[in-house]
UniProtKB/Swiss-Prot annotation:
SUPFAM superfamilies: Ribosomal protein L30p/L7e. This is Large ribosomal subunit protein uL30. Belongs to the universal ribosomal protein uL30 family. GO terms for cellular component: cytosolic large ribosomal subunit. Keywords: Ribonucleoprotein, Ribosomal protein. The keyword Ribonucleoprotein applies. It comes from the Bacteria. Part of the 50S ribosomal subunit.
Amino acid sequence: MATKLKITWVKSAIGYAKNQKLTVATLGLKKLHQSVLHDDTPAIRGMIRTVNHLVTVEEVEA
């Protein structure tokens, strides 16, 4: 089965660089404490690495 990543936005991006705010938006997160599911790809992993201090990540079997 394919692994998916559950990404939850847990800390505000206010005061952080613009590229980090854009990365949060690109991940599909619009509000704090919102969660989204994404396929586990290198591109998504790179975005998570950019904002790892703002989000939490869980691996989910889909």
